[in-house]
Amino acid sequence: MSTRNELVNLIDETYDVSQIEKEIALDNIALSDLELLATGGYSPLTGFLGKKDYDSVVETLRLVNGSVWSIPITLPVTEEVAESLKAGEEVKLVNAGNVYGVIQIEDIFVPDKEKEALLVYKTTDEAHPGVKKLYERPNVYVGGAIILTKRFENNPFPSYHLDPIETREEFKKRGWKTVVGFQTRNPVHRAHEYIQKSALEIVDGLFLNPLVGETKSDDIPADVRMESYEVLLQNYYPKDRVFLSVFPAAMRYAGPREAIFHALVRKNFGCTHFIVGRDHAGVGDYYGTYEAQEIFTNFTVEELGITPLFFEHSFYCAKCEAMASTKTCPHGKEDHVILSGTKVRELLRNGEVPPSTFSRKEVVEVLIKGLKKEVVTE
């Protein structure tokens, strides 16, 4: 079993694929999963899940060997492709004409997708973006160990795209013994900033790790978000206490289960702590506000290998004249300005400027510019 210090490394760019005839086409999700499997981001996983581990993860949030793992990492193929494959074969993994890796097939099986939806996403509603994607992807899963034979070249954020081994090195170089990870797919607003800085009071460093893989269409584009993080860190954070690097995974929107997954992955990137806020990785009204925090009570910190830090929903209080939460502020709802990424997106899309209690002016400027560009290109 992988401990905090053991990273899986499945990269071999000298691996000869010239004699391998069969291939499996990877969609964008499988491609980003391939990279994270190979770089150790998904340690202790060494490949796409076979049937036993898949069933175990879906039903118990653990691999067969007992390690905590909450999201099934699968390689879907069509029935037609599946018929041409058999266990024991080595097959190329291809995307847009490039061979990125190989899989040693151990298993080919048909999952019960309804069960996967119900247990992983807690709903079979196809309006849920994670469920919709699950049902859209092909119906047969191929399990087996992988090797990454080619790194991605067209990386949109090369200077921020670091492997777990590199972020660990960076934290060590900075002398950080304790590092808190923060997952985001939104621009950082004052509520996030308040939470991050509260956590920074008790640890050595903050690892801001925005997700830049596939997200839903109304999420703010990754390049705009990255620029918003840069201006925020430049103007409002101590440079020697925070490190920005991207998380190239796809967003699953699996709420509580994804919160566990996000914590485990950040442990692999070198974090000792992980921030879990309200409705972490949630979407719509599918999950309770603090369900993503409650799920952590099923596991010990020892078996997770990372300490979750739970935060209440924070807001700007007009009476306190400061950011606060119900833990620190005695005033009523009428004095609270509730901040949410969704609300900020709404204001921006309607051409309104969010107040400074919502977002730093430098961030707002970047977002307005970015959304104007988006409108022009649509």
From Swiss-Prot:
CDD domains: ATPS. Belongs to the sulfate adenylyltransferase family. It catalyses: sulfate + ATP + H(+) = adenosine 5'-phosphosulfate + diphosphate. It comes from the Bacteria. The lineage of its organism: Bacteria, Bacillati, Bacillota, Bacilli, Bacillales. HAMAP family: Sulf_adenylyltr. GO terms for biological process: hydrogen sulfide biosynthetic process; sulfate assimilation. Keywords: ATP-binding, Nucleotide-binding, Nucleotidyltransferase, Transferase. The keyword Nucleotide-binding applies. It holds the Pfam family PUA_2. It is an enzyme of class 2 (transferase). NCBIfam families: PRK04149.1 (NF003166), sopT (TIGR00339). It comes from Bacillus thuringiensis (strain Al Hakam). The keyword Nucleotidyltransferase applies. This is Sulfate adenylyltransferase. InterPro entries: ATP-Sase_PUA-like_dom, PUA-like_sf, Rossmann-like_a/b/a_fold, SO4_adenylyltransferase_pro, Sulfurylase_cat_dom, Sulphate_adenylyltransferase. Pathway: Sulfur metabolism; hydrogen sulfide biosynthesis; sulfite from sulfate: step 1/3. Its EC number is 2.7.7.4. GO terms for molecular function: ATP binding; sulfate adenylyltransferase (ATP) activity.
